[in-house]
Amino acid sequence: MAKQSMKAREVKRVKLADKFFAKRAELKAIISDVNASDEDRWNAVLKLQTLPRDSSPSRQRNPCRQTGRPHGYVGKFGLSRIKLREAAMRGEVPGLKKASW
């Protein structure tokens, strides 16, 4: 299982992303607006850089439900590749079978 601190850190990232979602969207809209002045766009970039890093949704990871493994995550099943293979070999995943050709 994943450490409790890793789970807490992920929860913190989700909360920060929700909290700053509107602010980030507003600043990104100014940055991508071609009609905005260069000074306004530059100020928006600087303000975006002052926001917490963990408020960016791209910092979030999808951990495996069984083990908490953050890499090799298969989103359709919510499991890491290792646990998905084990479950498939036991026949616990409906409609999933080992490939053979």
UniProtKB/Swiss-Prot annotation:
Residues 51-72 are annotated as: Disordered. The keyword rRNA-binding applies. Keywords: Ribonucleoprotein, Ribosomal protein, RNA-binding, rRNA-binding. GO terms for molecular function: rRNA binding; structural constituent of ribosome. GO terms for biological process: translation. Belongs to the universal ribosomal protein uS14 family. Part of the 30S ribosomal subunit. Contacts proteins S3 and S10. This is Small ribosomal subunit protein uS14. It comes from Buchnera aphidicola subsp. Acyrthosiphon kondoi (Acyrthosiphon kondoi symbiotic bacterium).
